[in-house]
Amino acid sequence: MLPSQTSQPAAEPVHVIGAAGRSGQAVCQALRDQGIPVVPIVRNASRAAGLENIRVADLTAPTELVKPALADATRIVCTAHARNIPALLAAAPASAKLVCLGSTRKFTRWPDAHGNGVLLGEKALLDSGRDGIILHPTMIYGAQGENNVQRLAALLRFLPVIPLPNGGTALVQPIWQGDVTACILAALAQTWHGPRSLVIAGKNAVTYKQFVSLVEQASGLRSRPFISLSAKLLMACAHVTARVPGLPEIGPDEIRRLLENKNFDISQMQDFLGVQPIDLQEGLARTFKR
């Protein structure tokens, strides 16, 4: 059963942790556009250009140093890495609603520090019993300065042919930054009790080969032929290409994860949050229109 869905008073401020990051900046702007007061919280004031009334706090610092920045918080968005959720729980007022960003990396077959940190943060939230939600996005694209499709487009400019592991048949379901922001704002507007975890993803899944072709089209690049190579060979090549000046780097771990299907059911995202994500082709068109 879905919880009741009622709006919070618009005048309640939202404390945004990680406000200087890509998702944090997008959330702050969207809140301001709706007339909702924002309390931006950053680790480094020098990175907070364009943000007003900032507070400086680092979730890796002792709890007593973080508490003052959150003392008056009733709604908190945390776009910092999910590994910081235990520290957030310790520092935030017990009554504050929490909306945190995780990652679908938690599902990888090859655990790493990033994915393990997401699992740690998710477990802390779910075990806390607090009114909070952790949203797990797939690959996020479309933010200013993002390092996913923009880096891929930059790499494609160097390649006469496109090598993909196993022919690029694994599925991906990237989510546009605007939809990530919409999900965060939708969660803020909901009322529920207890902790929740929810995957957010794009409207449609495509093969990685199709994804690359769509990035080519959207970025104005000519179509290049594909070749299928083993992941092991491509991972070995990645160690070599990392030394080439000016060539965008793709790490061996990233290549290995191209073998995983990353397609997800988004019915909870649509039903609970009420967000209908845009089509990948439309999102890429918006991204490269900048």
Annotate the PLM regions.
Residues 46-112:
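NAD(P)H-binding glycine-rich loop region in Rossmannoid oxidoreductase-like domains
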Residues 17, 41, 79, 98-104, ...:
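SDR active-site strand-loop-helix element
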Residues 36-43:
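Conserved glycine-rich Rossmann-like NAD(P)H-binding loop of the short-chain dehydrogenase/reductase
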Residues 154-175, 183-187, 191-194, 199-201:
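A conserved pocket-lining segment of Rossmann-fold NAD(P)-dependent short-chain dehydrogenase/reductase
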Residues 14-34:
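N-terminal Rossmann NAD(P)H-binding glycine-rich loop of SDR-like oxidoreductase domains
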Residues 134, 143, 168, 173-181, ...:
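Conserved loop-to-helix N-cap of the C-terminal "lid" that shapes the substrate pocket in Rossmann-like
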Residues 126-143, 153-155:
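Conserved beta-loop-beta element that borders a ligand/cofactor-binding pocket
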Residues 6-8, 12, 187-250, 266-267, ...:
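Mid/C-terminal beta-alpha module of Rossmann-like enzyme folds, strongest
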